[in-house]
Every structure is written in structure tokens, then in C-alpha cells.
Regions:
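Gly-rich Lys/Arg/Thr-decorated short loops/hinges at beta-loop-alpha junctions or inter-strand turns
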Residues: 10-18, 165-167
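Intrinsically disordered, low-complexity polar/charged tails and linkers
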Residues: 1-7
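A structural signal for small-residue-enriched, beta-sheet-centric alpha/beta enzyme cores
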Residues: 156-167
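Small-residue-enriched alpha-helical segments and adjacent helix-cap loops
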Residues: 14-157
Length: 167
């Protein structure tokens, strides 16, 4: 089901599996697993989502179930990969952009992990989207999310709510 990052595709003969990487950050061992999995299952239709997740298309049900298990063993989650509990989106150059006041990665990870831990207990609106921006690349579009954080030169964040266009 969609809550677990699995969706039937048109015609219901195949499905799609969506993989969640915490704030879009893929670890080296996960990249190795990803490369091995692409070869093992001959995955040919793969793309990144705007929520910094990865989607695999054209899969049969048995493959989706097997990938669900294998992903979990490698710290890749299908739950929280979209739908009502999407991934927290963060600047793609965080931690390496020399213009950053500081690395926002720990903040992005903490928000994402908190939401993953609490998704069964807190009631946030459907399709609630969050973003955290390093203040320079605007890739997470934090100012247009339901809740966004934009790093300032003062070591603070401007907070945007409800898809606002100003601090």
C-alpha cells in the first residue's frame, strides 16, 4: 500500500516501490546495496523523486516484498517515503557548501527521525511537507513547504509556515 511505499501501476500488472533515504542522504554502504540490487533484479526504470526518495517501477509483487525486506536490512525505509508522511527535504549541498554558516545536516536528520518515530502517534495533516535549506541553493524550496526552515547568516533559521512567501 501507499503507506509503505508501494503502489500499483496502471493496469495492476506491476507496481512501484519507493525508497526513503533520510533527508535524501545516501550512505556509501546503501549506494553499494543499491548498485547490487539494480543488477540483481535487472531494474531498468528508476528515478529520484522531488521528496529525495528513489522509485523503482515495473516490479512484480514478489520482488516488491523481497525488496522491502532487503531495504530494511540496509537502513532504507519504505514507510515515510511519500503519501501522508513524506521525507523531509534538505539542501543537496548541505555540509559541503563553503557559503554555509554551518552544516544543517544534524537538524534535518533530527526532524526526519522524529517524524518517522512519531508518525503513528501524532496527527499531522495529509501530505504535510517539510524542508530545511542551507540558505543558498534553495533546492528544498523551504519557503513553499507546509513548514520550512531557511538558514540565515546569523546562525538562526527563518521559519516559513503554510507555504508562505516571507519570514
Amino acid at each position: 500500500s501507499g503507506a509503505y511505499g508501494s503502489y500499483a501501476e496502471r493496469g495492476a500488472a506491476t507496481g512501484m516501490s519507493r525508497w526513503r533515504f533520510n533527508c535524501g542522504r545516501i550512505k556509501q554502504e546503501q549506494m553499494r546495496f543499491l548498485a547490487d540490487t539494480i543488477r540483481k533484479y535487472n531494474l531498468t526504470h528508476i528515478h529520484f523523486t522531488t521528496g529525495q526518495c528513489l522509485q523503482m517501477h515495473g516490479l512484480d509483487g514478489e520482488t516488491i516484498l523481497q525488496l522491502f525486506k532487503e531495504c530494511y536490512e540496509h537502513g532504507i525505509y519504505n514507510r515515510g517515503a511519500g503519501g501522508d508522511n513524506p521525507n523531509v527535504v534538505a539542501s543537496i549541498l548541505r555540509g559541503i557548501d563553503p557559503r554555509e554558516t554551518f552544516d544543517i545536516s544534524p537538524y534535518a536528520a533530527a526532524i526526519s527521525e522524529f517524524l518517522m518515530e512519531q508518525m503513528f502517534y501524532i496527527k499531522i495533516p495529509r501530505k504535510f511537507k517539510m524542508g530545511i535549506d542551507n540558505g543558498f541553493d534553495s533546492t528544498p524550496h523551504a519557503t513553499f513547504k507546509d513548514l520550512g526552515f531557511n538558514l540565515t547568516k546569523y546562525h538562526t533559521f527563518d521559519v516559513y509556515a503554510c507555504g508562505g512567501i516571507g519570514p
